[in-house]
């Protein structure tokens, strides 16, 4: 049973050798293997974004930097690997093998059904186009005013996620750039088809890191239950197949928790520094990693930190700061538009970090210490109050809030069509945040959500009552992000888009809380007269936690959004040729120019721009003349757009037909929707100009 150590640290049972002789004959490969894979992931992200920011991205530059960083970090993990490689008992070895099998199966299955999000409509297309830019141009400053589009009069270059800060200046890609740099590495190695499968690999690594930390928090079998439940969750499956950065964030975060717990157990400051690198890299991966970091910094400073954690916390904070330096350069130098869009998010966070520092400084004064001691005398009533608040607030959020509140915010979102389709009153300022707890229930199942709520409350109670700072980073991150995103997800509320808010921290964190409670209750029931019915009930709950997500995931097992688009873009590039320049028309009733200008520019490596339909023939001919040794093509969806234009015969560049998961607001997405995309091209030639007059 978990117990409090002399320092008040909550401890759990560790896998033990099956016999004394086993230790001499059989060293565990689990910990070294996990370390190797996670070190490769961390250093891949850091090397990729560093080389991209330097403007020299290519395999020839990324691989040596990646290798050097990986070797350095691998050497730094040697004490942790040596201390944690004792052989485990047979059942634990089987469970660990199963955890590896789950991770590998996730890579293989989700890699077989990649979502080819290559149009710049939403974040996935921006990420893949940024990766294409890196492959074709080698840097993050995107010079678009090149011949024949160096005279920008009447021309536009921006797209969803791509913006300029000054006229005729470079385009900046939104978001943090570690994830697209990792996709670009894959694309350089194996092409566009492999690029869109990168997240399947990152999803497998995330599952492995999640299990590894879960094994330390709960029993191995319970961690495996949580891993299976996560792997089968539709939110995890969907975003493992789609090119979004949440999976990278999830893997780095739980790798950091895992490494930090080893550092605490082994009193190892070097391992703590490496753990900090992982935790800080959540900001390298995503801007909202800053919220996670705020919770972790809070956990690593007084009054929360104490005992063994206090000895390694400075090293962990130093490691996190190292990663944050890289992230801050990426954010402020290479994503200035992203900063402008999120000032209202960044300023409160900055104030939060300052307040955390001031609180820590105040606690270390004599009056601060006295105040902490006075509060700690009531830690058990405080723990009881916190646990009760979690349960009551959770029930309220799930049962009551959706019935009594309609949440709105100051801006409007393009959701009116969806509201009409679902028979709702059109109100495009609705956030649907009042339903956010039920969103979790859709994908996790109510049994998992109920057990997770109780486990969350139980873990908080034990950690506060026993002053168990060992789990404070995990609990504060899970608690803070869950409360934040249940209260206000701050995202366009269509599904499954909005549900990615819960993926890096909330869903996995709650599943581990459920795993901890299952393991604890199982051991409490062992040896009691009523252990058979108790174990039977727990077995049923365990089965429901694993299997209920299949109600959502099962019918969509072979979901593959936008299938074939990668190959069709490669064919389009071949049809246009390396000596092409393309000008896309902004046609009424279509967004093809908005969705395809940057993807074609990035993946074909040719100059691209778009323009309004009012562009004159004289301007078209002038652009064709400026093209010099390139052929200027006018691109449109409607053949009528070429009438009266100085162009030759048009031909099909791209004809794409595929499916997407439906968008919903008040019900979970279950159906598939068909869509099509046609791109026609015609060469601009003076001989084809209509007669004057």
Where do the protein language model's features map onto the residues?
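Interfacial juxtamembrane loops and adjacent helix segments
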Residues: 132-187
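Transmembrane alpha-helical segments
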Residues: 104-112, 289, 487-488, 517, ...
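Membrane-interface transmembrane helices that cradle and orient dolichyl/undecaprenyl
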Residues: 256-271, 302-309
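Transmembrane-helix signature of polytopic, membrane-embedded enzymes
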Residues: 193-194, 210-232, 251, 264-274, ...
């Amino acid at each position: 049973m978990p117990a409090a150590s002399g320092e008040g640290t909550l401890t759990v049972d560790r896998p033990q050798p099956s016999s004394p002789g086993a230790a001499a004959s059989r060293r565990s490969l689990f910990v070294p293997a996990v370390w190797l894979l996670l070190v490769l992931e961390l250093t891949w992200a850091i090397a990729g974004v560093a080389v991209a920011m330097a403007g020299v991205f290519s395999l020839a530059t990324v691989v040596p930097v990646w290798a050097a960083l990986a070797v350095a970090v691998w050497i730094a993990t040697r004490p942790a690997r040596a201390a944690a490689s004792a052989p485990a008992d047979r059942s634990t070895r089987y469970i660990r093998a199963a955890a590896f099998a789950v991770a590998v199966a996730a890579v293989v299955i989700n890699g077989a059904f990649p979502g080819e999000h290559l149009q710049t409509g939403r974040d996935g297309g921006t990420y893949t186009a940024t990766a294409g830019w890196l492959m074709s141009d080698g840097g993050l400053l995107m010079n678009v005013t090149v011949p024949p589009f160096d005279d920008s009069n009447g021309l536009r270059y921006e797209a969803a996620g791509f913006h300029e800060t000054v006229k005729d200046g470079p385009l900046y890609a939104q978001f943090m750039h570690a994830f697209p740099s990792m996709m670009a590495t894959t694309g350089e190695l194996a092409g566009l088809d492999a690029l869109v499968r990168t997240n399947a690999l990152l999803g497998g690594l995330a599952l492995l890191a999640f299990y590894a930390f879960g094994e330390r928090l709960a029993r191995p079998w319970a961690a495996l239950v949580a891993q299976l439940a996560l792997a089968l969750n539709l939110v995890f499956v969907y975003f493992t197949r789609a090119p979004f950065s949440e999976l990278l964030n999830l893997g780095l975060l739980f790798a950091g928790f895992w490494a930090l717990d080893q550092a605490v157990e082994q009193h190892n400051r070097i391992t703590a520094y490496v753990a900090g690198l992982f935790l800080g890299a959540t900001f390298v991966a995503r801007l909202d990693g800053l919220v996670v970091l705020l919770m972790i910094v809070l956990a690593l400073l007084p009054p929360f930190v104490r005992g063994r954690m206090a000895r390694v916390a400075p090293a962990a904070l130093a490691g996190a700061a190292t990663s944050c330096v890289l992230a801050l350069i990426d954010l402020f130098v290479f994503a200035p538009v992203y900063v402008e869009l999120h000032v209202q998010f960044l300023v409160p966070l900055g104030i939060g970090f300052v307040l955390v520092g001031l609180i820590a400084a105040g606690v270390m004064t004599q009056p601060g210490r006295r105040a902490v001691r006075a509060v700690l005398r009531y830690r058990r009533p405080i723990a009881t109050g916190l646990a009760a608040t979690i349960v009551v607030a959770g029930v309220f959020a799930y049962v009551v809030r959706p019935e009594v509140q309609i949440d709105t915010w100051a801006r409007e979102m393009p959701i009116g069509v969806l509201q009409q389709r679902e028979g709702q009153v059109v109100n495009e300022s609705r956030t649907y945040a009042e339903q956010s707890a039920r969103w979790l229930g859709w994908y996790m199942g109510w049994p998992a959500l109920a057990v997770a709520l109780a486990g969350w409350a139980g873990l908080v109670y034990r950690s506060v009552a026993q002053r168990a700072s060992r789990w404070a980073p995990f609990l504060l991150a899970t608690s803070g992000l869950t409360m934040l995103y249940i209260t206000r997800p701050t995202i366009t509320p269509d599904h499954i888009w909005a549900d990615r808010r819960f993926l890096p921290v909330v869903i996995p964190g709650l599943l581990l809380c459920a795993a901890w409670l299952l393991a604890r209750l199982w051991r409490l029931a062992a040896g009691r007269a009523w252990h058979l019915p108790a174990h039977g009930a727990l077995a049923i709950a365990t089965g429901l936690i694993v299997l209920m997500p299949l109600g959502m995931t099962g019918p969509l097992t072979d979901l593959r959004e936008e299938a074939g688009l990668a190959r069709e873009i490669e064919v389009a590039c071949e049809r246009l040729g390396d000596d092409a320049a393309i000008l896309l028309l902004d046609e009424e009733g279509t967004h093809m120019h908005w969705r395809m200008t940057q993807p074609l520019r990035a993946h074909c490596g040719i100059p691209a721009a778009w323009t309004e339909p009012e562009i004159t023939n004289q301007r078209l001919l002038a652009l064709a003349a400026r093209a010099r040794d390139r052929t200027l093509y006018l691109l449109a969806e409607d053949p009528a757009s070429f009438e009266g234009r100085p162009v030759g015969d048009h031909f099909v560049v791209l004809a794409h037909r595929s499916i997407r998961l439906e968008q919903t607001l008040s019900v979970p997405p279950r159906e598939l929707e068909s869509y099509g995309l046609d791109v026609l091209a015609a060469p601009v030639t003076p001989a084809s100009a209509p007669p004057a007059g």
